[in-house]
Amino acid sequence: MENQDVNANESVFDPPVGITNPPIDELLTKVSSKYALVIFAAKRARQINDYFQTVDEGVFEFVGPLVTPDVHEKPLSIALREINRDLLEHTEG
């Protein structure tokens, strides 16, 4: 019975992580340079932020988070988690 109580209390959401988790070294393997990582993450964070601002209006112009965000998690942290999980494809340009 105790096992069932523990499983019932587990969160169904991914644990939130900050800018140091995922580690920067892991993120740098996904792009060609640290500058490319900054631009890539910033663009995606802006899309996520725009999505949250327009979702109440019923406008779905932007794609929402591809990972389960925490209530107080910032768009940049969400974007970095998406990049680390290879949910986004980066193209140089």
UniProtKB/Swiss-Prot annotation:
InterPro entries: DNA-dir_RNA_pol_omega, Pol_omega/Rpo6/RPB6, RPB6/omega-like_sf
Keywords linked to the UniProt accession: DNA-directed RNA polymerase, Nucleotidyltransferase, Transcription, Transferase
Source organism superkingdom: Bacteria
Molecular-function GO term, any one: DNA-directed RNA polymerase activity
SMART domains the record matches: RNA_pol_Rpb6
EC number: 2.7.7.6
GO process terms (BP): DNA-templated transcription
Catalytic activity field: RNA(n) + a ribonucleoside 5'-triphosphate = RNA(n+1) + diphosphate
GO CC term, one of those recorded: DNA-directed RNA polymerase complex
Enzyme class: transferase
Purpose: Promotes RNA polymerase assembly. Latches the N- and C-terminal regions of the beta' subunit thereby facilitating its interaction with the beta and alpha subunits.
Family: Belongs to the RNA polymerase subunit omega family.
Assembly, per entry: The RNAP catalytic core consists of 2 alpha, 1 beta, 1 beta' and 1 omega subunit. When a sigma factor is associated with the core the holoenzyme is formed, which can initiate transcription.
Name this polypeptide is given: DNA-directed RNA polymerase subunit omega
Organism: Corynebacterium jeikeium (strain K411)
Gene: rpoZ
